[in-house]
Amino acid sequence: MTDKIRTLQGRVVSDKMEKSIVVAIERIVKHPIYGKFIKRTTKLHVHDENNECGIGDVVEIHECRPLSKTKSWTLVRVVEKAVL
């Protein structure tokens, strides 16, 4: 049995907390009846140890043990910095 660590990529939507960010993960799902493809967004609280992320950055995150009530993801790397 292999335990793969779940890794996702998303955009930072909030960095107002200390050592924490909120990342929006977008996915496309097909409507079960009408068949239209719809964008769905999931917001995850992520641990950012060095406060290196800003709003608009594209980041890679992976799952970890629960760090608080809402945080169970941690930052791996910043894929792309936001253009100001």
Swiss-Prot record:
GO terms for cellular component: cytosolic small ribosomal subunit. InterPro entries: NA-bd_OB-fold, Ribosomal_uS17, Ribosomal_uS17_bact/chlr, Ribosomal_uS17_CS. Pfam families: Ribosomal_S17 (PF00366). GO terms for biological process: translation. Keywords: Ribonucleoprotein, Ribosomal protein, RNA-binding, rRNA-binding. The keyword Ribonucleoprotein applies. GO terms for molecular function: rRNA binding; structural constituent of ribosome. Belongs to the universal ribosomal protein uS17 family. Part of the 30S ribosomal subunit. One of the primary rRNA binding proteins, it binds specifically to the 5'-end of 16S ribosomal RNA. This is Small ribosomal subunit protein uS17. The gene is rpsQ.
